[in-house]
């Protein structure tokens, strides 16, 4: 039985899951948080840090040695400082949340004169290397005041890959095989066959070279190359006639001989017959070691070695040349006894490298290296040294090439080596054994006879020969996840490499000029690289903050796009498709619709990344047909070799698999196997889906396309004014709400001491207090009415009361879209599926007025409007209430500084911040001169540029922030805000101090009451301390008390020290805060003052808003109908929403119907509980009824609810929370069956068919037949008609075409397009058409004249020449065709 926490006891979900959960859902943000923690290693001692992240990057670049080698800069360690501003201040001020990185480096200068490297002097110093962004505890970064998320990237793993072109390159359709070595950084190396079966190589996708050039550059001769890649047949040449072949019978298979093959006695194979496997066996059995063959058997074979006349030293035939009659004669003449030839055939022993050597123009190692140099650096004259250096730097030095740990592991596995660790560079035995430097000797002694490049070429030839398979690049074994930490590390290293170049230049001067490390290192390149990555990288995204689910999903997203990844245009179907290896790692449902489909995925619920960055998913181990509780994580590569059963496989009480054949997955196939064959079993039925898809109840009854829409639309739900838990959920709602970080969770257990709307104070349990300085009080500040990235409102509400006993992890306060710690994205609405006067045609939604009245879907949006006063050429702009030509009425909401009051209700066009801008002198008319002479000079030289409320917006001002540049005097409003802030902070600190002080005194009191006094204020020696005595004593006099009991005296001293320490700490913190508030702000160049005004906008639901269920059933509200007109039930209850029943069958999302039935049952059970409470039923009866609801079905696993844990008060409290409906959980792929839903309906005393008789609201008549009615969780999406509705009066025009701009943001017009023109033509409305194409569009003179005419009351128009005609003329002239208009 599970024990219930304080929060869970308030309301328990009835779970229909039949499978016991073995593994709790892991922390959902772990992929972000763990990755960045490993990158920073901030809490690890400097000496204990691993070579990853910041530490790894610094170690890989340092030491930096000068060109002369006389000076070096070594890395010692690093530490992260304290952030200057906390998260809240960074959001408010538009700053980035980060900590300064200080690296300790050591400058070592060596003595030039001494023969050994003697150290002349050492200087160690701390160097500032810029700000490193810090991650908030919810996995986000604050960059320039906005929350951003770094999305993890799914990219191709480094290593070696074999592939073919699918027959697309050559017209014959022949498969051309290729191999590619991809490093983590460095040059790519490709090998590929051409249609003539020669093998070529490319470096960095440049022009191809024969592969033998690369091998020759490594130091291999022709003979060595042939010896590596071919087996040799040896022929002994008889002096007079005939040849003896050293027989390996297997090598004759498939050949047709021109002579009989005998074994001394009988003929084994007749001439002209093909040798088969049977013949080969006979030959092996006969034991013949040599075979006499005629001379012509040798003709046409390829020599494996040079043949040299021993007496004269003459080269008779070179390796890789063919044997002909003349050469056989020459061999006999020179007395050559034996020659070796290559064993090749057309079937499975291709002569690929032999063909390649024939087209290779080079002969020596240097020639080959020069050829590679010419290909890499065309046009540069090659020198011996340059060619050698370039070749060495390509693949063999760690500075320029890094295969990485992952790449080496993948490489070694693919070429069939046992060990997975190794060197990050490509190794070749021949190349490194020929070199004589220390690093090469180390590599040769460690790695010996292996060769990476040769192994890859051999593997490619094997595949071409028909042995071996190509790789599937879409398999998750070949794609890995690059998370925040790794990307930040790569960016940091790039910055450091830029620093290294500059430092190397300066190091030579360091000795002569006595430079220090601080003078050597310029931190700008590092800081710039990091800032660029976090600020503007494709993977650094503005966080989707619509609701808690959208935050969690955004942080768990995996993108195949981004630097080093794919592009939308190039990605084909295969990459986007669902792959067999996605099972349990990537969600098979959730992905965006549109151009990114399949390129952006979501992590499955239980998936995680392993040390190499590959995705892995957990499985339960199955031993001899019995399922154990042991859980193992397997990656896509490992999973391939096991038989894995599904989570819903039937087992008995001991975990023994009961079916004779179990449905399983093995090597990507689905099949049935006996239980004894099964190795593993899924952990949970929802293992294959992501968090968003796992929130859709009855997902198993929905079509996948609609499930995809449902999962995606939940992310767009706007948090409503009062969140309401879904009546039908899946049981994962609580996990999502807790892990998203929008709720406030208790850090430690204890008792609630104080609660108000903005703060919760917890007195911590004695057992959880750590150390002597810990006062045992936790203070939680709540977020109040803050703007999210999507302009929705973030607000936290306390759930606890004073005196409540809580445990660690309990939910203390709800955030947006959470209800008692559960995710609550929408509202439970009473829904009827029926047509209603055509108002639900094409997915439209009919809504009851009652929904609007009860504010069920009212949402609060917070808009931030900014006014900036800049320094201009003509003088500085000024924020003031003194604005020319504006009525008093327009200014009545501004204070004397020209800024709107908090609490003012404003509408479109109202002034929020008054601002005047100086304008240039213009030529004045005589009338204006007269006016100026009369009324003075002032009003003319400034123009009004105030911040006004944008069109279509109205709301209440809830906050104003004024930022003033350093060195500029603050206005009155800024001082008021400053004073208010200081007062607020002071009160906050005073309250905190008072709470802590109170807790210390309370604890001290319990320790000294009843003790005997030695001395003290107003008390005699030997008296006993009592409570009333302490109450009458000043608090400071408590510390004068001295007792006989040493422990009590210690307690008094400890309390005094604690209070003094806290006092000092709070004073320090207050002075820090105060200086931050009073200091000037760091504004952009040229900005003198900035005012931010926050408006709270209340949006009621209205026609045109988009709504959706969780099953992809979306629609737009077509009409809001009075309650009395809505269809109603027998008892008079009107329905809330009417949906079209035709929206269900074609879309195949039947889950919504099941949800409606179960939701109705849940609501009915709530009504029954309410009736029992109203009738003051006995607690025992209530207990019995709840037991019937929760524990009716013995087949439901150990999740049964133990009501004996609940006291009567707790049970009553829970029952009150259930009156609105008993929440149900129908887990994905393990949900409620039809019988269970019927049983619930029965228990709720509702018709088990799920349909009821409805009556017409207009007439009161019953409808013809019964209707499906019930409760569905319905969401309001962030596609509100208020944001889309737009009308243009007079607005801006495009510069070139002079046509009105388009779009709401540009205050544009509606496009009158081609089809609209056809419509007017069809109606013959010639004048309207002329007006549309001229004065209402781009006839500049015409529209100006029209304006004047309307002002004069003359309603006529004269159409002129449209500007677009002039544009056309200019376009034609740009083609050098003159076109002129003639007056006719």
From Swiss-Prot:
- BP-aspect Gene Ontology terms: DNA-templated transcription
GO-annotated molecular function: DNA binding; DNA-directed RNA polymerase activity; ribonucleoside binding
Q: What is its EC number?
A: 2.7.7.6
HAMAP family, sorted: RNApol_bact_RpoB
Q: Which InterPro entries match?
A: DNA-dir_RNA_pol_bsu_external_1, DNA-dir_RNA_pol_su2, DNA-dir_RNAP_su2_dom, DNA-dir_RNAP_su2_hyb_sf, RNA_pol_bsu_bac, RNA_pol_bsu_CS, RNA_pol_bsu_protrusion, RNA_pol_Rpb2_2
Q: Which CDD domains match?
A: RNA_pol_B_RPB2
Q: Which UniProt keywords are listed?
A: DNA-directed RNA polymerase, Nucleotidyltransferase, Transcription, Transferase
Protein name stated in the entry: DNA-directed RNA polymerase subunit beta
Question: Which lineage ranks, top first, belong to the organism behind this chain?
Answer: Bacteria, Pseudomonadati, Pseudomonadota, Gammaproteobacteria, Lysobacterales
Q: What does this protein do?
A: DNA-dependent RNA polymerase catalyzes the transcription of DNA into RNA using the four ribonucleoside triphosphates as substrates.
Read off the Gene3D superfamilies from this record: 2.40.50.100, 2.40.50.150, 3.90.1100.10, DNA-directed RNA polymerase, subunit 2, domain 6 (2.40.270.10), RNA polymerase alpha subunit dimerisation domain (3.90.1800.10), RNA polymerase Rpb2, domain 2 (3.90.1110.10)
Catalytic activity as recorded in UniProt: RNA(n) + a ribonucleoside 5'-triphosphate = RNA(n+1) + diphosphate
In the UniProt record, the signal sequence range is none
Checking NCBIfam families in the record gives: PRK00405.1, rpoB
